[in-house]
Amino acid sequence: MCGIAGAVNFNLSHNTINATMYHRGPDEHGDYASGNVNFFHLRLSILDIGGGKQPMHLDDRYTIIFNGEIYNHNELRKLFNIKGTTASDTETILLLYRQFGTDFLKHLDGMFVFAIHDKENNTVLIARDRAGEKPLYYYKDNEKIVFASELNCLKGMLPLQMEEANFYHYLRLGTFYREFTPYKNVTELQAGSYLLIDCSTLQIQQSRWWNIHDFYLQENNDPFEKSVDTVDAFLHTSVKRRLESSDLEVGCFLSGGIDSGLATAIASEYNHDLKTFTVSFDDEYNEAPLAKLVADRYNTHHTEINISFNNLKSDLEKILRNYGEPFFDSSAIPAYYVSREAKKYLTVIINGDGADELFAGYRRYVPFSKY
């Protein structure tokens, strides 16, 4: 996890960025200014620790700030016969953009948000990954455009005003729907989308480079057994790539469910010294015993963190403030405690998020089966 911020026609406050997003990138920071464009990057070093410093430049024309990981970047270098001076996936993005423009996005397997300034065309490209795993918010008015990884950062640099109409979505759905945020003129860049900003006119061209809806429209007539084998192969590739893309040790969160248990089982095939972490509660919702069964089965180094009401009284406000907006999902609470404990030992974690949504893990997803 890194933190990025940038602006067109606006001077970034480095102090504010550090104050609000230091937790995203404590290892090093860098800045860039050219004409009316400003970038700032806070780095959490995971891959090519010595050679992946940012902002990164290419040909005295392109400059990038990047948050995320491209799991197949080495494969893409071989596929397109491109060579760089580092082993960094950041440089791979720049090299691919120089060669293919925005068409290269469809080849990326990863979680990412990045911004590239093209000095020759006087544009800034901002792109987000397929699932929206990495966050990006941007503010636009008639005079400037400012973007950052977190709402708290924008709020610290700009006199934002509440957009009361957008709270309808939150009160009805428990979340701000799609691009909407609590603030006027502030938009969340949608998953699988990119912005191309003309730095001279502040005009924005927004495009979807990937849409999950297209895949729902595709029929799959494979027999059940073949579908199981296909999912198994994809899961193994996914977990293996995440383990191999880090120069640091990788661990797993365990919730007691099938999703994180399966991720742990696969990870243990490639890492025989795996660390796992779970939270426990003093009530009927406690799944820690199930998590321990998985940990014992795969012989992991397991840590269990107990959460009590006394913990929550002292930490709840801090947990909520981290999101920069009202947040309805109670899973934020155990996620905070298990992450805080895991950070004592590791920097990179694999979890099982998304499995319930993809495979209808709850009864509430049954009505969608007709689609």
What spans do the regions from the language model cover?
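Cysteine-centered catalytic environments shared across enzyme families
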Residues: 1-324, 335, 339
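Exposed, low-complexity/repetitive linear segments and helix-based recognition motifs
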Residues: 284, 326, 350-353
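Catalytic subdomain that performs nucleotidyl-dependent activation
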Residues: 327-334, 369-371
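Active-site adenylate/phosphate-handling loop in enzymes that bind or generate adenylated species
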Residues: 337-371
